[in-house]
């Protein structure tokens, strides 16, 4: 921030920040005091995750939009990344996308139920599955298990962090087997709520993506349980089947490039 005054007067800085407590207020005040046009860039909280970090994204979006207005920013730039492989289900983007539009348009906060209704209506053109609510509920997994890792979900970290000893030490310091089991049960309830509901084509594709994200998260939490129990070789899931499901979900929306 102290270097903001060194920027050319034609520069238009973008203040990036993705956590619920990112200091947009302080940073915006510094940049605005230099007389520069600027924007704030919150995030969807979806990357490096299988279910998103919806509560963090919600708070991050609210802070960005409110501080953009407070400090006279040109607006907000919603960011969604594919860091480390784009493993997130596409549908986890929708709540953040619609909520950022709501906040930028009139600045009014929304509770989750009307936002879920908006996702159902505007994205899926149907409320049969109430998929908007299920997406946001799955996005609470990290809060459910008491994890507050910055810029990633614990479930994603359990599957993709190669430093196993570091992961185990993190679990032993910050997690318990009970929390891991609670997280697995939490995800199972979402699956049960979705099962048997009628759906249209858009809902069906998004539901498949979400269920795959939930399955990957469950696999990860089971891996966490194994690490906590001292049995890291335990691997009960069917890896080839999961890879086939992931390939199918990927190719339903994207080109093959990046899949391998």
Task: Tell what function each PLM region has.
Residues 1-260:
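Substrate-binding groove of N-acetylhexosamine-processing glycoside hydrolases
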